[in-house]
Amino acid sequence: MLESHYYKDMVEAGCDEAGRGCLAGSVYAAAVILPPGYQNAELNDSKKLTDKKRKALREQIERDAVAWAVGVVTPEEIDKINILNASFLAMHRALDQLKVRPEAVIVDGNRFKPYKDLPYTTIVKGDGKYLSIAAASILAKTYRDDYMDALAEEYPQYDWKANKGYPTKKHRAAIREFGVTPYHRMSYNLLGTGELSIDFKD
């Protein structure tokens, strides 16, 4: 069972992001405040759960949470400010939207940009240690997956329904064959060969 809270007797928001390593699409982050003493044995790192389980847990998290929100940073913004800063910005946007103001923040990973004047703690593999971070990882992942599934309808050739924008062989082969879309992150090594961009034929 994951820990319910890191900070004792404080309103604490857990944060996590999804899509940092993707070649295409926005980066998503979620912030979740769970009730004091909350318990849920099924909550865990979203990467360890099936898609069906994540979707079911998303509904439960949204019902049970004191507050929750999702923040999004676009590929254009990622290219301007880099993916690390974009991840921080997505988390800040999620925190901005919370209907209850947290008194502290816990974040998956080892880096975070301070949010307002709130105390914060970064926790490596936090999505497998704290319930609110696990909940945030599930919301960020499922909302981003839904977004990539919608983009896949528009651009089916990139196999985004399966790869969600991550750098698979099929995704990179499609970039070579069809070029890039407005959703690709141009600052990334899209072809995996040291080449960032592609020459389009007239």
Predicted features, each with a name:
Residues M1-D202:
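RNase H-like, Mg2+-dependent phosphodiesterase core
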